[in-house]
Amino acid sequence: MAMTDPLGDMLTRIRNGAARRKSSVSTPASKLRARVLDVLQAEGYIRGYSEVEFGNGKAELSIELKYYEGASVIREIARVSKPGRRVYVSVKSIPQVANGLGITILSTPKGVMADHQAREQNVGGEVLCSVF
C-alpha cells in the first residue's frame, strides 16, 4: 500500500526516535525530505543526516538526532499542512511557534525554508510543519 503522507511519516519517525532516545533514525529518501532536514540541521534541531543508497535504486536517509543534557532538542514536531487539508499563508500571516522560540518550515517558490528566512525574502507558501 502506498504511503499517503511521506513527510508526516518522517516527522513521526523523528518524534518516536527522540522519545525512545535513539541516536539515529532512518526513513526512505526523497528531495522534499532532504530539504526539510537541511532546514532542521541549519536551525540546530538535528546533528545531521546522510543518504545511504542501495543497489536496487532505492535510497534511505539516516538522521542523527541531537540531545542536550540528556533531553531531545526537539520538544515538539508537528505536521501542519496535510494531504487532505493544505495550509497556505502569505508572508504577513506566517505563524510564530512558541513566541518565536520554535520555527515553522515552509515550502515556497524559492525553496524550502524556515519562517524567518521567508519573512526576510518576503515570500509565503505552504506551511509544512512546526518545530519547537
Curated annotation (Swiss-Prot):
SUPFAM superfamilies: Ribosomal protein S8. Signal peptide: none annotated. Gene3D superfamilies: 3.30.1370.30, 3.30.1490.10. It comes from the Bacteria. InterPro entries: Ribosomal_uS8, Ribosomal_uS8_CS, Ribosomal_uS8_sf. Pfam families: Ribosomal_S8. Keywords: Ribonucleoprotein, Ribosomal protein, RNA-binding, rRNA-binding. GO terms for biological process: translation. GO terms for molecular function: rRNA binding; structural constituent of ribosome. One of its GO terms (cellular component) is ribosome. The keyword rRNA-binding applies. HAMAP family: Ribosomal_uS8_B (MF_01302_B). Part of the 30S ribosomal subunit. Contacts proteins S5 and S12. Belongs to the universal ribosomal protein uS8 family. PANTHER family: 40S RIBOSOMAL PROTEIN S15A. One of the primary rRNA binding proteins, it binds directly to 16S rRNA central domain where it helps coordinate assembly of the platform of the 30S subunit. This is Small ribosomal subunit protein uS8. It comes from Sinorhizobium medicae (strain WSM419). The gene is rpsH.
